[in-house]
Amino acid sequence: LSTVQARKTTEVAVGVLLRPDGAVLLADRPEGKPYAGYWEFPGGKIEPGEDVQQALARELHEELGIEIGAALPWFVFEYDYPHAYVRLHFRRVFDWGGAPHSREGQRLAFVDPAGALPQPLLPAAIAPLRWLTLPAVCLRSAVHAYGHAAFIANLEVQLARGPALLLVDEPCLSQEEVRAVLDEALPRCRAHGAPILISSIHAALAPLVDGLLLSPADLASASARPAATWVGACIESATQFGNAARLGVDFCIAGPVLPSAEQPAASALGWHGFAALAAQAGMPVYAAGGLSAFDQQRAQHAGAHGVAVNAEYR
């Protein structure tokens, strides 16, 4: 057996408590524990007979004196610490009763994930804090279907509605045509603080934007993470998550969840199928296919980070 296989896996429930303004609660580890003084998300070990929701409710009551509502699945990943090999079940919590307060001598702070963070951070908390800055809505361009002018007009409407990430994915357009789209989309996205990514089909334009979305073929053939602030991947099956993790991809897009004009019912995962797929990701996953931004809450209950939708939705 390998060293990791030979070690006992400790199952841990992790609470990501999010206020309406996007601030997230962190706590530092008390004296006497490994990594004392390091900041982390609250939570703790899942005891025999508990599920993740039950364990998290108990831990957050014991640590913070609060009663939580539904804890929405976000992702699960494993981390190998010198003192323990842990499987971390991250759950986002938007609803709780009572004011979080220290019951175990730990310091607490609500922080902006995109701002200055307390230091030092527990290693397994670093990537999730960065992932929290990803918007819950990913707008996918469809210039090939709706035309350049209609796309830009609708993009302004969608960006005004709230935080979003724009993905320019135009396999039918030439590089020159995509560059013309970017020339108009970039200033609008910058004005709203919206990151913009481009499909790896037009990877030559990636230096102009904030990141790259790898196609399944490019994900399989890549030997290293592309040099970009954000790197995403389109996923068609659970077996591709291994390649995504190996490259250090930040998020995946998976679907189709529901039937659409482009994708028939026979290929749709359904919400249960999507939830089963997302549970294996180890990173944030956007639900795609037959969805609108109004499906965001349903998607998050199924384990999605958010939804990937056409920028032309009304």
Predicted feature locations:
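Glycine-rich phosphate-binding active-site loops on the catalytic face of alpha/beta enzymes
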Residues: 212, 216-224, 251-265, 290-314
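Hydrophobic faces of well-ordered beta-strands that scaffold small-molecule active sites
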Residues: 135-142, 166-168, 196-198, 212-214, ...
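Conserved N-terminal beta-strand and adjoining loop/helix that marks the start
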Residues: 2-25, 76
